[in-house]
Curated annotation (Swiss-Prot):
The keyword Hydrolase does not apply. This is Probable spore germination protein GerPE. Keywords: Germination, Sporulation. Induction: Expression is sigma K-dependent and negatively regulated by GerE. InterPro entries: Spore_germ_GerPE (IPR024496). Pfam families: GerPE.
Length: 128
């Protein structure tokens, strides 16, 4: 992995989501995961034990295909200037499991799973 010296003059961030990363500099590996269950009801009430991730198929990692890493490529790189210079970064929002990096990363894995459940008393919500 190439090594750099990252220089950032000014950073402005308004909001970072769950498991979001803003990184200046090199990283060996990054594994960002977030999971959420959002239940919207017409009449608000809480049912004990309803927020179990294993009850929903979307939260199992069995269906995620992660490519296998291969190192068959031979490189000869001359890094004449190891500096990464950035003047200004303005970031409004970085959502769940998002990554903004100034630098090098050898391996990154980002996974965000959110299920939204809407429960209404009537078949269709009233348009008032």
């Amino acid at each position: 992995m190439l090594h750099h010296v990252s220089i950032v003059q000014n950073v402005s961030i308004i909001s970072l989501g769950i498991a979001a990363v803003f990184q200046v500099g090199d990283a060996n590996q990054m594994e960002l995961k977030s999971r959420a269950i959002a239940v919207h009801r017409e009449i608000p009430f809480y049912i004990r034990g309803e927020g179990r991730f294993d009850a929903f198929e979307i939260f199992t990692d069995e269906h995620i295909t992660i490519p296998k890493r291969t190192t068959d490529v031979k490189l000869n790189i001359v890094n004449e200037c190891p500096f990464i210079e950035v003047n200004n970064v303005e970031l409004r929002t970085l959502l769940n499991s998002g990554c903004f990096q100034i630098g090098n990363v050898d391996y990154g894995f980002n996974n965000s799973r959110i299920i939204q459940i809407r429960q209404y008393i009537t078949d269709e919500p009233s348009a008032q």
